């Protein structure tokens, strides 16, 4: 069965442009992905990141879902420690009520920002050091399932809308920790190979081997998220990859400005030490023309036993991002309006409705 192809859009701001332009580009690209037959598009949560326009994925989700007709739209993801589980439950129940069967909720454990900004989000030093992600996840699930113990102080709280369940839940991660937690909870799992490509195979295999079936997910479902740099030719792709290199170098040194342009990256005098540091970083982008990138991605997806591939790119220019979306749709042989996992998610939705009933 062909693997579904999905899109992670970080809503990057290229040097010399505005956040408004970045958001409008993301809308246009989502409409394009919808027309080409992509299965889902996700938006991330980042704070105090001047190079990224989306700090509130739930707002992007509502707008994009209203502008598209078939595409699933979700958070990739909401950083659970930054928010009260009750608030997340009510926000995504409402999104599900507005767009039934088209919303995804991906959950992450990282702050999505620096320490000071995380403190501003969480309001206490204790919250910064607490390793309570599993407890927060359990609380979110208990709110949705009305499954708090009889003596729990939250047992009488009913998230609104009360007659709508949460959409399908996914845990996001770049390590074995999140893979095991997703498996034990019987949830979907999305591995961030664009952050840690080397860890994809062991984490996804561990998830599948440890999976405990649940009413939400009778079977495991693993998404492999990869960064791709797709050029018109191999040489063009290698030229574009200079943007990735300069971006990674800036991220490593804490420079969080707008994404560099190709001209800016081409002028930068990389030292041998900087080249070595970039090569040693676990973040990786598959570079080449569309056929070369497809071959590399397919090989990793086969090795990791991924059920679905999700592509993103660190290239900020709209034309480069548009080419990536079009070319990946071509080499993955997408057919607009057809989804190879519609039946699977129909089963998941039916199970969720059975819980609600």
Model-derived features with residue positions:
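Short, acidic/polar
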Residues: 20-32, 174-180, 290-299
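Hydrophobic faces of well-ordered beta-strands that scaffold small-molecule active sites
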Residues: 5-9, 41-43, 73-75, 103-107, ...
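An alpha-helical appendage that flanks or caps ligand/catalytic pockets
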Residues: 126-158, 199-306, 333-356
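A conserved active-site cap/scaffold subdomain adjacent to cofactor or substrate pockets
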Residues: 175-198, 203-204
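Active-site mouth loops of central-metabolism enzymes
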Residues: 9-24, 78-86, 163-173, 281-290
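N-terminal beta1-alpha1-beta2 module of alpha/beta enzyme domains
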Residues: 1-71
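Flexible, glycine-rich active-site loops centered on histidine and acidic residues
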Residues: 2-19, 81-147, 189
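Conserved, mostly hydrophobic/aromatic
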Residues: 5, 33, 37, 45, ...
């Amino acid at each position: 069965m062909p693997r579904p192809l999905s899109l992670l859009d970080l809503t990057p701001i290229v040097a010399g442009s505005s956040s408004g332009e970045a958001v409008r580009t993301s809308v246009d690209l989502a409409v394009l992905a919808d027309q080409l037959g992509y299965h889902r598009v996700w938006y991330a949560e980042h704070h105090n990141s001047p190079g990224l326009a989306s700090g509130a994925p739930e707002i992007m989700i509502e707008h994009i879902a209203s502008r598209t007709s078939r595409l699933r739209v979700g958070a990739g993801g909401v950083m659970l420690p930054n928010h009260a589980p009750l608030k997340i439950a009510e926000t995504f129940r409402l999104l599900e009520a507005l767009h039934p069967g088209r919303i995804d909720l991906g959950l992450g454990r990282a702050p999505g920002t620096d320490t000071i900004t995380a403190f501003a989000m969480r309001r206490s030093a204790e919250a910064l050091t607490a390793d309570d992600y599993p407890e927060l996840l359990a609380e979110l699930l208990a709110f949705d399932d009305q499954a708090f113990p009889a003596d729990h102080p939250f047992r009488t709280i009913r998230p609104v809308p009360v007659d709508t369940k949460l959409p399908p839940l996914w845990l996001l991660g770049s390590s074995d920790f999140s893979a095991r937690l997703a498996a034990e909870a019987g949830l979907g799992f999305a591995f961030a190979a664009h952050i840690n490509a080397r860890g994809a195979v062991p984490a996804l295999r561990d998830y599948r081997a440890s999976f405990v079936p649940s009413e939400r997910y009778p079977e495991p479902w693993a998404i492999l998220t990869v960064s791709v740099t797709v050029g018109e030719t191999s040489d063009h792709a290698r030229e574009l990859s200079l943007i990735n290199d300069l971006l990674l170098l800036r991220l490593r040194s804490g420079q969080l400005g707008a994404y560099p342009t190709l001209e800016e990256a081409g002028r930068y005098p990389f030292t041998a030490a900087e080249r070595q540091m970039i090569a040693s970083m676990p973040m990786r982008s598959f570079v080449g023309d569309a056929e070369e990138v497809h071959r590399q991605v397919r090989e990793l997806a086969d090795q990791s036993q991924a059920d679905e591939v999700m592509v993103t790119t660190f290239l900020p220019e709209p034309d480069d991002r548009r080419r990536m979306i079009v070319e990946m749709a071509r080499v993955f042989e997408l057919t607009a309006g057809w989804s190879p996992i519609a039946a699977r998610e129909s089963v998941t939705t039916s199970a969720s409705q059975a819980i609600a009933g």
